Structure formats: C-alpha cells, structure tokens
C-alpha cells in the first residue's frame, strides 16, 4: 500500500510557506522597537517579555510549572481579542509548525524506491480505541493541510476516493441514549446544530443565524468531551452565568440524553469500568474519587469512552467488511489511509462508480440500528 508523495510539489509548497513565514516575521518586527529585532517567536520566555512587559497585555495564566506566564495557543487566542500582534504570532506559529512538522519531515519518510510514504497504525495508543498514526502521523495534518494534500498522488489511471461517516459520534450518542430529539433529527435528516441553537435561544429553527448555529454546534460536540460552564464561557467569550444557562437548556432539551449520561456514570461507579457497544472495557479508577477535579475528569472519560469507543469500533468493523467486499468483487481498489471517521481508498478509474456504491453500502450496514 502506501501513498505516492510528489517531492517537487512538497518542496514548492515548503518554499511558499517559508516566504509567508519570513514576511509575517518582518511585519511583526516592524511594529516593535529595535530591541526585538531578532526575537525568537517560538521562545515562550521571549514572548512572555514581549507580550506582558513591552506590550503590557494582561497575563492570563501561569505555566504548568507555575514559574512563568503562559504564552500558549489558548492565551494568544484570548489576547488576540484586544491586540492584533498575538493574532499574527498565532499565524506565525501555525505556519512554522506546518513547515517543521510536515513539509520538512515528510520528505524523510519517502521510500526512495517507490516514492511512497508508509505510515504506522496503532490499535492501542489511544485509550478510547481509536486508531493512531505515526512515523509519520497522517491523521493530524492541520487546517493548512490542503496544501500538503496536493502533494499526494494516486498511481496512473487511479483516483482517490474519500468516504466520511457524517457526525458518527453524535449518531452513536443518539442510538445509545435513545433520546427522542436526537433520533428524530437524524432519522429525518434535520440540522441537529440548528435544533440545539433553537432550544438555547428560544427561537424557531428557521430564524437561527449562522453564529447561533455555531454555538449549538460547539455545545453538541462539547457534551461528548465533558463540556463545563467554565470551558464554554471561555470558548464563546460569554459570562459564566450565561454559559451555565446554555448547558441547563441543553439538558432540558435532551432529557433522555441527560438521563443516559447519568446512568453511565452510576454504572461506572458500581462496576469501576465502562463498556462500548461492542463490549470493549475501560476501567475508570477515579470515578469514586472525593476529589472534585479527579471525579469530573473521570466522568468525562466515562462518557467519551463509550461514545468515541463505539464510533471507533464501527469504523474498524467497516474497514474489515469493506476489505472483504473489495476482494470478493475483485475490484481494483485498496484502502490506503484511515483518518478517524474517514477512509481514503485508491481506486482504478474503471471501478470508481461501483466501488463508490460498495463503500456506501458496506459502511452504512455495519450496525443494525433497529
């Protein structure tokens, strides 16, 4: 298997990104005094002085070691609301990471004989059961990754076919909780994020704005990862009280979901572990802890494991069934990459329509939801 990587394309992208990095650096430096003419924007210590001493911006939080003030992505994002330079630094860091982590390192993994990259997948690195990719990690290409993806090429007369499970974790959540609102939304192909937003803002779904829908989306996905009023208030830049109101409205809107989550927690307290739909077990030792922080973390782990773990198993079973079906039909196609809820196949042009239909049929029939 493996994926062909066009070195020339990647080198061209690297050159363009390098030019953008250099321009961004110069634009930042021009707005500072001469003492910062050679500042290292990747140095937390130098950034700390620039942001909190020179620019006199408010320090938001300490580092994990509590020896200095943090300049991480979360801090820069907050500071960007009151000053433009932190936003420029964020962009600089994103591009620098793209260059150092992907554009330069990917070339080292290209097989000189085949011009292909072969990633390594692990079944056990992620506690929820998801597959993980390493050497190189092809599951974690960032937002600017569309540039990098253009360097991946199919073999002659072949095409790439992408198949992505739509909102698989929310659909799994609907099935496991049997929440009437969630089930109705997915059965009738409604906009679940707009439905949530309508409940939050006491409006008809048709009147929901794109900004309101984004809030609904943030809460829908956040609930899978233990969304708190504190986290939501920071994410949306709203008061803690309003964030708490949003969460309360969500819980009253999705009654069966709330009851199901409580039952998962109680079951975990009793057994000491949680299980996915396919009986994959994960122990949650902190679920009976009196320490509030440990207990809250354990609750998030319990819910997330059941939902994300079940979704991961569905994808894996889909991969197994699809591989068998491709071989049975003798199609000129093969899976070359799994990116969590998405499968990438390389398919001969002559088989593309038949394989597209096969992929849809196989992946949608992994579980009998009835």
Task: List the model feature ranges, each with a label.
Residues 1, 219, 223, 303, ...:
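Short, hydrophobic beta-strand segments
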Residues 120-205:
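Function-dense linear segments that define catalytic or interfacial modules
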Residues 322-370:
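C-terminal structured "cap/appendage" subdomains that terminate the fold
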């Amino acid at each position: 298997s493996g994926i062909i990587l066009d070195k020339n394309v990647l080198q061209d992208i690297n050159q363009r990104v390098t030019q953008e990095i250099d321009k961004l650096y110069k634009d930042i430096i021009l707005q500072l005094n001469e003492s910062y003419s050679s500042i290292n924007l990747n140095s937390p210590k130098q950034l700390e002085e620039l942001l909190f001493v020179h620019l006199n911006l408010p320090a938001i939080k300490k580092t994990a070691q509590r020896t200095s003030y943090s300049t991480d992505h979360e801090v820069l994002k907050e500071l960007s609301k009151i000053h433009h330079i932190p936003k420029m630094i964020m962009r600089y860091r994103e591009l620098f990471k793209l260059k150092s982590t992907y554009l330069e390192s990917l070339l080292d993994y290209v097989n000189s004989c085949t011009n292909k990259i072969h990633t390594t997948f692990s079944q056990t690195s992620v506690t929820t059961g998801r597959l993980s990719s390493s050497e190189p990690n092809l599951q974690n290409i960032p937002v600017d990754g569309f540039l990098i993806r253009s360097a991946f090429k199919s073999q002659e007369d072949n095409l790439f076919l992408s198949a992505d499970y739509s909102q698989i974790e929310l659909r799994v959540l609907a099935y496991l909780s049997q929440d009437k609102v969630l089930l109705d939304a997915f059965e009738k192909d409604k906009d679940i994020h707009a439905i949530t937003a309508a409940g939050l803002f006491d409006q008809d779904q048709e009147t929901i704005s794109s900004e309101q829908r984004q809030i609904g989306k943030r809460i829908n996905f956040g609930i899978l990862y233990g969304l708190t009023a504190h986290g939501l208030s920071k994410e949306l830049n709203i008061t803690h009280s309003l964030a708490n109101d949003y969460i309360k409205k969500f819980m009253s809107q999705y009654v069966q979901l709330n009851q199901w989550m409580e039952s998962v927690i109680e079951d975990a307290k009793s057994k000491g572990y949680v299980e996915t739909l396919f009986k994959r077990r994960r122990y949650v030792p902190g679920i009976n802890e009196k320490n509030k922080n440990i207990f809250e973390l354990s609750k998030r782990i319990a819910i997330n494991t059941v939902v994300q773990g079940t979704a991961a198993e569905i994808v894996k079973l889909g991969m197994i069934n699809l591989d068998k079906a491709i071989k049975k039909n003798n199609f000129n196609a093969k899976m070359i990459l799994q990116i969590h809820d998405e499968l990438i196949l390389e398919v001969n042009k002559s088989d593309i329509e038949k394989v597209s239909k096969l992929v849809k049929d196989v992946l949608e029939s992994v579980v009998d939801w009835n």
